[in-house]
Amino acid sequence: MLQVYLVRHGETQWNAERRIQGQSDSPLTEKGERQAMQVAQRAKALGITHIITSDLGRTQRTAEIIAQGCGCDVILDPRLRELDMGILERRHLDTLSEEEEGWRRQLVNGTPDGRIPQGESMQEVSERMHGALNACLDLPPGSRPLLVSHGMALGCLVSTILGLPAYAERRLRLRNCSISRVDYQQSPWLASGWVVETAGDVSHLDAPALDELQR
């Protein structure tokens, strides 16, 4: 059975400042670097064979730190990018106008084809994330890949594997450097295809982004 591990990037400067990142970028904080190092220790123990990451800077840096710990090369896949938040990227959440907050709410509340102007819908993100995940089926037998991606993108992926709409991602708590696992099973008795084994595990972190619950 193929096991694929899903990791959200470490905490970034804009996470800490409550800015909208999307496909724009900000560097990892000191805490984010430490979180990635703790994932690296876990990845080494798990026997990770491949590290595949979004090509955005914060995920690349997280993947590089993990790769140093488990001796893997880093492969870039732009399908693992975060949801494109269009014209709201780089904005502080507290500065959104009523109209702009309405766009954001339409997106996260599942309004059909809801999106920020010049951005993506959650269904579009889900489709490309599934493409990246399904590519793991072509890896050599015995592979144990780890994908480094983003909070909303991973939430859309996990939600739709569970048979829920992509916007159900808001019901998942995938903190910075949390680890989720999905398995590909083929069974005459159980549902064939991808199944969710764990979601949002932070047991490997000494400070699992508790501040996210307080902001």
Swiss-Prot record:
Keyword Isomerase appears in the UniProt entry: yes
Residue positions binding substrate: 8-15, 21-22, 58, 82-85, 104-105, 151-152
Keywords tagged on the record: Glycolysis, Isomerase
Known pathway: Carbohydrate degradation; glycolysis; pyruvate from D-glyceraldehyde 3-phosphate: step 3/5
Annotated catalytic residues: H9, E82
Superkingdom, taxonomy of origin: Bacteria
Keyword Isomerase listed: yes
GO CC, one annotated term: cytoplasm
Pfam families named in the record: His_Phos_1
Entry similarity comment: Belongs to the phosphoglycerate mutase family. GpmB subfamily.
Name this protein carries in UniProt: Probable phosphoglycerate mutase GpmB
Higher taxonomy: Bacteria, Pseudomonadati, Pseudomonadota, Gammaproteobacteria, Enterobacterales
Protein's gene: gpmB
